[in-house]
């Protein structure tokens, strides 16, 4: 395992809680780096992470009320509203289709994944000793010809692919 404090960056494909929901806990456990994502994903995370914290705090309150009667130990939520709101300062917003360089030898580009507003697949180029390799993280990929969401961008080549495969 990697300690959260040893991680420099999070590259976030989209705001759905199964992808973003653990970020406040990582920050609580020591992550202090940048969370790099698209503009819309950062904006949606503002709403969704606060909502997740609210649900967790409500659940903890309910469990503790019931648990006290049964003599159970206090239930503590994974993170609080303050934790969720504090994470927002770590977000770095990035436009689609622009190559950014978060560190020496690392280039990153977000392309539209067509899954929801702000969703992306992420292309990463790593250069070391004049050797360049490309890694693609698909994220959740949307469908073609949807009325409100753009079609996903096709990435034609990569040395390595990490593919979302829930369905």
What is each stretch, according to the model?
Residues 1-11, 20, 27-167:
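His/Asp/Glu-rich metal-coordinating catalytic cores
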């Amino acid at each position: 395992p990697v300690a959260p404090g040893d991680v420099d960056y999070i590259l976030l494909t989209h705001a759905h809680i199964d992808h973003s929901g653990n970020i406040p806990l990582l920050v609580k456990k020591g992550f202090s780096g940048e969370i790099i994502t698209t503009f819309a994903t950062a904006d949606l995370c503002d709403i969704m992470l606060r909502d997740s914290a609210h649900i967790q705090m409500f659940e903890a309150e309910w469990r503790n009320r019931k648990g006290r009667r049964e003599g159970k130990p206090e239930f503590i939520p994974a993170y609080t509203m303050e934790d969720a709101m504090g994470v927002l300062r770590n977000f770095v917003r990035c436009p689609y289709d622009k190559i950014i360089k978060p560190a020496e030898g690392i280039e990153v580009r977000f392309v539209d994944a067509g899954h929801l507003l702000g969703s992306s697949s992420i292309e990463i180029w790593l250069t070391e000793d004049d050797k360049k390799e490309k890694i693609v993280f698909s994220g959740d990929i949307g469908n073609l010809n949807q009325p409100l969401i753009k079609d996903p961008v096709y990435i034609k080549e990569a040395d390595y692919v990490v593919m979302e495969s829930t369905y």
